Structure formats: C-alpha cells, structure tokens
C-alpha cells in the first residue's frame, strides 16, 4: 500500500518524461486561472460586505467620490479571460462596458474594483413564473367571488318601482311555503297594509304639529288683528270663476288664508309629493299600452259594448277592478238635491241608483257642477238670480259663507266656485263603472238630448222615428267611450254600429246616432258562454221581466252606495264574474302547453307582466303578485315580497307559478283558466254538439298537435286519407237508395260528402261544339278503412286486364247514358274500378249541362286553298258522322255544318235557354231533367268536362286542333272531355 502511495506522489515527475507535451504545474494555465478565480471570488465577497455597510452614494457632507472609468478592451479581456470571477447568481454575468465605478473618499489603500451588478438597485427585476401563476389563480378566485356577490346584492336590492320606495312598509321572504298558504299569507298582509292607509301621514302631521305648536301660537296671536283686513280682500281675490275641470288645488274657499299658514309649507310639500305618488301609483290597467289580437267581428262587438255601456252602465268585464278604487279616486257618483231622478231613471237600471250622499263627507268632484234639470227648465238663460241662488246653495253645503265687508255692491255678487280636484288616472280608466244618470245629465247639459223629448218608460222597446230629436254626434260618443284606445277608424265604428248594434239608430249621413231606449244592451251569441258577458256583477237580465225588475238582496257599502247581491243559487256565477278582469285586452299565448298527469298548465305557465302590473294581488293574466316567473324553474330567484303603506297590492319579486285556476280572495275561477289543454276543450265542444245546443257544423275544432308538433289531421307519407274539400255537392239533391241485401265486410259512411269541382282549361278539340259543355256526376262507393296491403279475391287481376276493364267501363257508361238519357245504371251490375289497392264501385251517373265556353285563340291558322275542296271535305266528314253513332263517336264527334246548333242525343234533354237560342240557365242551378240522387257511398265523385270546337256558317277547316284527352280524378270520378272556364258564351253569337 505504501509503495502505491509513493508512486502516486511521484507521478507528476514521471509524467515529464512519459508525456513530453504536459507542462509543469507552475506553468499550467488551468491552475493559474483557478487561483485567479478563487482570489476574485474572495474579493467579490469582501466588496459585497462593504457595499452592505457603506453606501456608494454621495454622503451628506456633499463630498465628491472618486470615480474610475472602465475601458472597453479591458472589460472585454477580463470578461473572456476570467469568466468565473464576475459570476454571481443574483447579478448579471458581466459589467457594462462604460460603467462608472464609485468609491468613497474615506477609503484608504488600494481601490477595490466595485461591481455594480452586485448592487440590488441596479439589478433588473426578474419575474418568477411560479409566483405569477399563484397571483393569477388568486385573482381569478376573487373575480368569481365578486361576480357572485354582485348577483347576490342585485337579488337583495330588487326594490321594484322607485316611485313606491317612500311608501315601502315591510318585506318578507318565503322559503318552501305551499302556493295556497302563500296566497293566504299575501291576502292577510295585503289587508293589513291597506288598513294602514292614513296612519303614517297622521303620525307625521301630529309630530309636526307638536314641534310647531309654539310657533303657530305666536303667529296666530300676531295675525289676529289682521284677519279682518285680509278676509274681504282674500275672498275677492279668489272669487274668479274657473271653467276648466283641471282646477288648481289652490283655488276655492279653503285657500283664502294660505298666506297666514307659513309654517305648514313643509307639510304641504309632503302632501303634494304624496299626491303625486298616489297619482302615479293609481294608474289603472286599462291605460297600459297593449297589443290586442282580435278578429274583425270581436273588435266590432267590443265597440258596440263600449258605446252601449254609456247608456246602460253595464261593464263588459272586470267590474270589480274599479269598485275598490271608488272611495280613494272619487269615482263615487254624487247625486245633487235638485237633480231630476225620474228622467235619469229611464236609462238607468234599478240596481245602479244611488241614494243622496252627504257632500261634506266626500272629496271634491272632478267635473264642474251642472245646474239641475229643474232650474234648466225654468230658466234657460241662466240669469244672475239663478246664479246667485245656486252659488248660495253651494256655499251653504260647503259650510262656508263669505263675509261681506261693504254694505252695497255695484256688481252682482259672485260667490267662489265649487272646489274641484285634478283629474286622476283612475278617472280615465276605460273599465271604470259608468253611471248612466251622470252621462245623460252631461248630454242634456250639452243640449243634445232634451229631457222632454226622451222616450217614455212605457215605450222603451219601441223604435224611434228618424225625424225625432235626440241625435248625438257619433264622434262625441266615441270620445266618451274612449274608442281611440282600440285604434279604430270612424268608418269602422259606423259599420260596427250598423251591423252589430240593435240599440242604436244610425243617421243617413253616418255622423249621428240615437239611443233606442231600454235598460240592456245588445245581446250577442258569445254572451251566453259567460266569457264575454256584458252584464255587471249581480245584474243579469231576466227574459221573463221586460223592465228588468228582479228580486235581489241589496247591500249598502261603506260609502253609502247600494249594490245588488245575488242569491245563493247564483253564487258560483257571481264569483266567476267577480274574478274576471280586463284580461281580454291583454296578450294571450297562442299555444298552451299540455299539462302532465300531476301538473296543470298553470303551474308551468309564466306571467309576462312587469313587477308594477299587480293589482288586487293578481296580475293581468291571473297569476299571484306581479313578478314574472319563467317556465324554467331553475332560473327562479327567491326574492322578497314588498308591501306598501295603504296599498291594496304587493310586489312579489320572486314570482309565483300560480294556482290551479282558483282565486284566493273570491274562491272563484281565476281569469287564467282559459289556458286549458286542447283535449278538454275538444271534449266540451263535442259534448255540446251531442246535446243539441250547437249544430255539428258550428262546433269549432280545436287543433291538436301530434308528437312531432304538426297540426295536420293525416299523415300523407304513411297513410292514405284524402282530405275533404270545402265545396259541397250542390248539384245532387238526393242520393239513390241502396239495396238492403248488400253485404259489406268494411264500414261505410252514409253522411254527405264534399266534392271538388276543378274547371278544365279550354282547348280546341276538333269537331266539338261550344255548347257541348257538360259535367258527368257519378255516384261511387268505396271502402273506408281498408289497409294498403289488403286485397280482395275479386281484385286479383293482372294490370292489362284492369286497364282494359277500366276503359270498357268508361265507354259503356257513356254509351248507356247517351242511349238512355239520365236513367240510372242498373244496380245489379255495378262497375268496379280499382285505383291502387282501393276498390271503387260506380253506382250511377248523369250528365249536367253547363254554359257554353269561349273558344281558345288558334295556335296555327291555315287559309283554305279552294272553297270547293274544303266544302267537299266537310261534306264527307259530315256524312261519316251521320252514318256512325257508336260510343267512340260520342267521345269525339266530327264537325258537321249541316247539324243544328241545338241538336243533342235523343234521350238527353236540353235547357230552356238552348231551345230558344238564348242564354242558358245558371250554371250551378240543376236543370229540370236532372234526376235526384242520394250519395250512399263514402265519397261521391263529380267531374266537369267541357269541349269546344270552331264553328262558322261558312264551311272551313278547324282553326285549332288538339288531341282529346280524358281527365280522371284522383278519387276515381271521370270527366268526359276537356273544356275551359265558364263564361256564359252562346253559340248564336258566333254566326255572322
């Protein structure tokens, strides 16, 4: 072992002789560079420690530093010859070529080279990919969280309308509550919120009075001496008449002392703001813009109902929508003491009469007061005396009298006008309750219907003479009925009144109408179903009593108005009419989804209204609340139910799929029950048809979709079931009775079938007269439910035999008809015809003569070379035609100039027009010789054939020729010849 170590120790010396190219260790370049790199690393570590303790920047004493300039060549050599000396893992590999090295003045001794790359301030920022990915993931998570919080905040901040934000009372959230229980809770909370109508305003006013009581006392004490001075001046300044119905709220007797109540300006501002909010809140549903999809007949009926409602006072639908707002909106009719109720009662039902109401307990009226009818009869000129008397009555009823400061008045005394309130949206509701007495009073005030010329009560149902008075401009009634909402023209309104109304009399010029009298409007056929009922709630007409007097219970409401209530037998009908609203003017979905066995169509339906469209807890389309819910239940949001102070409705931001057609308040059927499936509607229609109430043809078939979504009643690619046509077979009066001993293995139809009569284009068929225009009516019999692949033994023939038999049957049929006239075919030998796999049996047939047809224009005209040759050829053709009377000649006859114009087969009759050379009878009217037929088969066939050929008194060649063809209907009927359209052409007009 020791020898081996000694050999290794002496190895470098031996290498000199063994390897002459190896140099000594002292002269080795690798070892020298290694030493230099080690020394450089030591110097770099020392300089790094010095840089951490002392700053290379300028000191606070503003002494300059010694700087040295680096040479580019020196930097290049140092970087290439000593690459490891400048290596630092946290710095750049080399220094820049012109880096200014800095050194402090306090440094002693040799200058240590300073490497700026080791200073952190001069290092470039290095981005680590791992840390960037971590930050990116955090940013993504925060973004998702922010989006989720935004959605949640949006869900919680759904306040509905901003107008009602100040009236917000409370809000609740419901989780997992059944729909019926939720309806009950909503109804209870709505009643509670509606009962707090004046609580908030009263508390606010009381607190304001407590705070300003001292100030009010001081103001009253200081203004007590000036009250007498300002009384007369204020009364005189506010005594000017106001003719407009939109009178300002500051006018009237109550506003005489407004200058003294300065501290109550804030309360007035709050009151005015509340009035504006109430104005915007009470917008009725009838004023919302909507697109109505109605037919022309429905629109005319609606126009007539609107016009007759002015005189009858009977609502079309939804009478309860405006009754609940009568107290708040001031729609309660005010009956004045001097009003003549007898004249107004002629056009007012007994249930709509209201007793006199104390004027002090209600708010001011919107309309300007009209003088009573008695005063108008006594004095039409409205002198000062009547004006002063009426004004005195008004001041006494208002409880305020004017203090006259002066003893004598140079001008007539003018009392302040009665107070008026501004017009509210509910006053313009087209579905509001109409009071006929007020409407008649307004028309009398305009001088259009004098009271003495109104029809008496005993002559209500009689007609009105056209020269009597009482005509009213139709434009005025259209404005009163607000028909501009329906977007109809005056001409359309005139046509509706003329066609649909039985209570209006239209003038000759169409500008005026007159009410014929009566308590009820026009009754339409659709009113019997109850959907389009014109009668108001509890006011159905009785056919037994002409004057409409019925025994009903009268209920006095809170405002003193009497309404008639139905009996217990009419409870269901009463509730059904209560729940009906103006949903007929809103959009209804065209397609109703078919419900499953455990879910109705209302559960999967949707409410299409905005959140502000709720009234009385039900939306326009019969769904609870007012929020819209989507058909996809995954997108539903559990929002809050917001209740407002004094509002009889709530805002349900979560939505409600709706009940199964039951109203929570009345217990009746909701208006949304019209969304029923097509199967139930079809069953009801068929049941009514079976009972005999509706004829079978009047039953409207409800389209039923198939699994593929098609409305077609048959599948043309899978089954052969020819569709029936709309043109009835009017030519056949009665069908021929079938023999009783015929046995069939397949079902037959005995009902009358509808045929299609297709006219043929005119063609110049050679040798056929224009009068030869006829139609072959054939009675056929065929199976109804035979399968496509089923065959009978009698039909097992070859194709050639079938074609031959078909041709022979047609020829024999025409030959028999030409020889025997209109006699029927023998029933013992029916003609069988096979089309595909369906057997067709021809029972009988006849020929019906039609009007002549015009000739088509000639395609090619050849002038005759000589009259003699053409005349001889025509004579030859005529002689051949006279000799041959076979069946083929009947199909295509040759032209014969010597034949008479009205020459027909012996046994075939002609019409009266053909006998005298005049125009024939009507084409569609059957002739005298047409035999009565009865369609006993499943489908009768009729085809029309017309043949036309050139005729002339001068013998010549035919102007146009074409090959004759037979037209066979797809149902099996046949046509003898090809012809053209009917035009009443007569052959006598051709002769010159």
From Swiss-Prot:
<dbReference type="GO" id="GO:0005634">
    <property type="term" value="C:nucleus"/>
</dbReference>
<feature type="compositionally biased region" description="Low complexity">
    <location>
        <begin position="525"/>
        <end position="535"/>
    </location>
</feature>
<feature type="region of interest" description="Disordered">
    <location>
        <begin position="1"/>
        <end position="112"/>
    </location>
</feature>
<keyword id="KW-0090">Biological rhythms</keyword>
<feature type="region of interest" description="Disordered">
    <location>
        <begin position="872"/>
        <end position="992"/>
    </location>
</feature>
<feature type="region of interest" description="Disordered">
    <location>
        <begin position="515"/>
        <end position="637"/>
    </location>
</feature>
<feature type="region of interest" description="Disordered">
    <location>
        <begin position="783"/>
        <end position="804"/>
    </location>
</feature>
<comment type="similarity">
    <text>Belongs to the FRQ family.</text>
</comment>
<feature type="compositionally biased region" description="Polar residues">
    <location>
        <begin position="320"/>
        <end position="332"/>
    </location>
</feature>
<keyword id="KW-0805">Transcription regulation</keyword>
<feature type="compositionally biased region" description="Acidic residues">
    <location>
        <begin position="877"/>
        <end position="888"/>
    </location>
</feature>
<feature type="compositionally biased region" description="Polar residues">
    <location>
        <begin position="386"/>
        <end position="412"/>
    </location>
</feature>
<keyword id="KW-0804">Transcription</keyword>
<feature type="compositionally biased region" description="Low complexity">
    <location>
        <begin position="221"/>
        <end position="239"/>
    </location>
</feature>
<feature type="compositionally biased region" description="Low complexity">
    <location>
        <begin position="944"/>
        <end position="960"/>
    </location>
</feature>
<dbReference type="Pfam" id="PF09421">
    <property type="entry name" value="FRQ"/>
</dbReference>
<feature type="compositionally biased region" description="Polar residues">
    <location>
        <begin position="69"/>
        <end position="89"/>
    </location>
</feature>
<dbReference type="GO" id="GO:0005737">
    <property type="term" value="C:cytoplasm"/>
</dbReference>
<feature type="compositionally biased region" description="Polar residues">
    <location>
        <begin position="42"/>
        <end position="58"/>
    </location>
</feature>
<feature type="compositionally biased region" description="Acidic residues">
    <location>
        <begin position="915"/>
        <end position="937"/>
    </location>
</feature>
<dbReference type="GO" id="GO:0007623">
    <property type="term" value="P:circadian rhythm"/>
</dbReference>
<comment type="function">
    <text>Circadian clock component involved in the generation of biological rhythms, in particular in rhythm stability, period length, and temperature compensation. Behaves as a negative element in circadian transcriptional loop.</text>
</comment>
<feature type="compositionally biased region" description="Polar residues">
    <location>
        <begin position="247"/>
        <end position="264"/>
    </location>
</feature>
<feature type="compositionally biased region" description="Basic residues">
    <location>
        <begin position="1"/>
        <end position="10"/>
    </location>
</feature>
<feature type="compositionally biased region" description="Low complexity">
    <location>
        <begin position="975"/>
        <end position="992"/>
    </location>
</feature>
<feature type="short sequence motif" description="Nuclear localization signal">
    <location>
        <begin position="550"/>
        <end position="554"/>
    </location>
</feature>
<feature type="compositionally biased region" description="Basic and acidic residues">
    <location>
        <begin position="421"/>
        <end position="432"/>
    </location>
</feature>
<feature type="region of interest" description="Disordered">
    <location>
        <begin position="199"/>
        <end position="276"/>
    </location>
</feature>
<keyword id="KW-0539">Nucleus</keyword>
<dbReference type="GO" id="GO:0006355">
    <property type="term" value="P:regulation of DNA-templated transcription"/>
</dbReference>
<feature type="compositionally biased region" description="Polar residues">
    <location>
        <begin position="559"/>
        <end position="569"/>
    </location>
</feature>
<feature type="compositionally biased region" description="Basic residues">
    <location>
        <begin position="207"/>
        <end position="217"/>
    </location>
</feature>
<feature type="compositionally biased region" description="Basic and acidic residues">
    <location>
        <begin position="59"/>
        <end position="68"/>
    </location>
</feature>
<dbReference type="InterPro" id="IPR018554">
    <property type="entry name" value="FRQ"/>
</dbReference>
<feature type="compositionally biased region" description="Basic and acidic residues">
    <location>
        <begin position="363"/>
        <end position="385"/>
    </location>
</feature>
<feature type="region of interest" description="Disordered">
    <location>
        <begin position="320"/>
        <end position="433"/>
    </location>
</feature>
<protein>
    <recommendedName>
        <fullName>Frequency clock protein</fullName>
    </recommendedName>
</protein>
